[in-house]
């Protein structure tokens, strides 16, 4: 199961894995895949067609425009991996 907070929007054909956590105001566009154990923080946006890898963390307010590798952390606009 996944945990979605208040104000989350999940688009058409989105696939959400097990144990995913989404903070308030997260927007997941259509045709997105979120891997198991991912965490997406407040106000983040994941654009259409993106895959968020298993165990990844998306920082608050990030705009994810490309795939996120498993077990990585991305932040910013556009979202980039932390070094």
Say what each PLM segment does.
Residues 2-75, 79-82:
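Structural signal for interior beta-strand "rungs" in well-ordered beta-sheet cores
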């Amino acid at each position: 199961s996944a945990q979605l907070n208040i104000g989350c929007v999940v688009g058409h054909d989105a696939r959400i894995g097990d144990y995913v956590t989404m903070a308030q105001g997260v927007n997941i566009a259509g045709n997105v895949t979120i891997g198991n154990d991912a965490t997406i923080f407040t106000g983040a946006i994941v654009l259409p067609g993106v895959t968020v890898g298993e165990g990844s963390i998306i920082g608050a307010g990030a705009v994810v425009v490309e795939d996120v590798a498993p077990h990585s952390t991305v932040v910013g606009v556009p979202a980039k991996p932390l070094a």
